[in-house]
Amino acid sequence: AEGAVTKVAGVSKQDGVKNVFVRGLGDRYNATTFNGFAVPSEDPEYKNISLDFFGTDIIQSVGVNKAFNAGGISDVGGATIDIVSKELIGSGNLNIGLSGGLNTQTVTADFLKQDGVNLLGFATTTEPADENNWGFKNKLDPSKQSLQINRSYSISGGKRFHIGKDRNPLSFFLTAGHTTDYQFTDETIRNTTTSGTIYKDMTGKKYTENISQLALANVDYDMQNRHHMSYNFMMIHANVQSVGDYTGKNSIFSDDYDNQGFTRRQQANDNLLIVNQLMTNWGLTKTLSLDAGASYNIVKGNEPDRRINNITKAEEGYTLLRGNSQQRYFSTLDEDDINVKAGLIYRLKDNVEEISNIRLGYTG
């Protein structure tokens, strides 16, 4: 979906930025819908869902609307991007996909992974129950991995049936996928005061692993070629875990050795998005129809056991800092979202090639 959207005039993608820009306007000025319903981001830090999840085996079409319309979302200054999920075409199919990749420069290099995240990317979120004991489930030291292979698996398929004497078509379509990829970066972190004084100047290495799963299901039922009902389900699980080791100057370190020290930051963001949609279309007459539907979305964002350790340079090597310089932090976010829409549509002409109509309805 992202590749298709960026080919539209006025839409661009910047390296290192998660979402697209429309006429120079970023995430907060755009909106994303899924089958016409507003859909939240899988990442609580963003307003719009990442288009990276939507490959050609998942979407039927994607549209970009840069002009205001009465049925659209109001808080949009750039564009509304509507993703239409895939439905079964034909009587049935089955597809299986497998891909892999590696970086020959780093494939056998030591890669640091934090403790507490399993192979599927689900993190251990258990907090210490006893504040006097602080029995953490996760180890403080990261582990080392010596073989990094990017990999992706997918499967999709569906089947069509005919129900009753009218042979009304009932179709099912399901797709699921898993992706794991690794990133290794050299980083430089510098901070200054408003007067230009440098109080932080550190360099280091960051090891990042991205694990995600996506599942999408669609059920369609047509009744007498006049009424249509469909249910869509989508689940996105995304885990980003990283370990960063940095050395250099930081004002929190002891000034006896020019504020030199070492920082290790271990962080995992474990996010889950679940989308449920029910859509109906009722042909009341040849020229009048009723569209009605509802969606229920669930977002869960976890940042379990973020670990930050700082040690300062000293005469005997490195020592722990005093005060609140060490950190183990837990955060959770749970949000439910309900959207409904209904509208009466009157076709001005009873002609297949004539699409002019009048619509009166509600979306919210």
Residue ranges and their predicted role:
Residues 1-21, 25-27, 36-70, 77:
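Periplasmic N-terminal accessory/gating domains of Gram-negative outer-membrane beta-barrel systems
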Residues 112-117, 186-197, 245-258, 307-316:
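Flexible, surface-exposed loop regions and adjacent strand-edge segments
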Residues 88-93, 162-171, 225-226, 285-289, ...:
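Short loop/turn motifs that connect adjacent beta-strands in outer-membrane beta-barrel proteins
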